[in-house]
Amino acid sequence: MRVRLAAIEPLNLKVFDFDYDLTFQVMFLSPDEKVYSRYGGRCEQGPDARQSLAGLRFTMESVLAEHRSRSPRFAPRETGKPFFIADIAPPRGLGRCIHCHQAKEVIYDRMDREGKWNLDMAFRYPPPDNLGFVLDVDRSNVVKDVDRGSPATDAGVQPGDQITVLNCVPVHSFGDAGFALDRAPKRGSITVSWFRGDREMSGKITLPDRWRRTDISWRPSLQGLVASPRVFGEDLTAQEREEHGLTATQLAFWQKSKVPSQAAKAGIRPGDLILGFDNQTLEMDAYRFLLYVRSKYVTGETVKVNLIRNGRRLNLPMTLE
């Protein structure tokens, strides 16, 4: 039976546990509120970059097959007393429509006041791309691409494999994969199972440092955390790059004459030759660097600004705001 829910207030969030920054989410439930699957997802490329009607149909058929199996599998969920957004929403928020992303803001605000918030929470529901495999939009749990040398490659995953379980969560869709990775530890490894043709296979994916990091600039609930590099200017010419011993494609730009207060406080001066942050050689121009910082860092983090001044290389610590 299909039910359209347009408000989050009456929902038990222990059941309807998903990425609340999304504009569209489908939950496949059993009559006793066990979760078969979650369909929905997005990224910085746009609200529909990770979903399609064909993908929804594929997931529906996959879930129906699961439902008809002898031992249907369900996603893990928190049990116990139901939890509603009204339990923690401020009184002024009640009696009005609360959007899903606002529910997330209320939850995060409460955690912050209780001292439970940390920056890792900004990177919830990381996509499988972060571990090196991309799911097909129209065939929701089928691997489209695998990055060479990635954790997914090391685990044995190949394009065309059909992911069935990730971190103990049944996978029918991109949304299921995100839910599975949201539950994954900060470091260590997670299990993954897949079908390659008729063969059932499995492996372990090792979680690298900062593996959760992804672009949060599209998330309504996290706009206050989107960082700015606070340095910007004109890219070096080919001749200037040659004079400074730099490659033709690596990040290198002259800091413009107006230096923002945060950068000035860190010691950045007009005319500094900026090479990037944290000793990473980045293949991009100054504009792409702006987008890179927005996707990889959050406000409050301290970075080391790598620059050249009068022929000397310097690394100046700066807190992003």
Q: What positions do the PLM features span?
A:
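Sequence context surrounding c-type heme c attachment/ligation sites in exported
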Residues: M1-V3, R42, G46-G132, V137
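Conserved PDZ fold ligand-binding element
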Residues: A152-G175, A263-A286
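PDZ-domain C-terminal substructure recognizer with occasional recognition of PDZ-binding tails
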Residues: T164, F179-S217, R269, L275, ...
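Thiol-based oxidoreductase modules, predominantly thioredoxin-like and allied folds used
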Residues: M1-L11
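Structural micro-motif
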Residues: F18-M27, D272
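Terminal peptide-recognition signature
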Residues: F133, A152, G160, V192, ...
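A short, hydrophobic beta-strand/beta-hairpin element that forms part of a small beta-sheet core
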Residues: T23-R42
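PDZ/PDZ-like peptide-tail recognition elements
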Residues: G95-D145, K204-K256, N315-E321
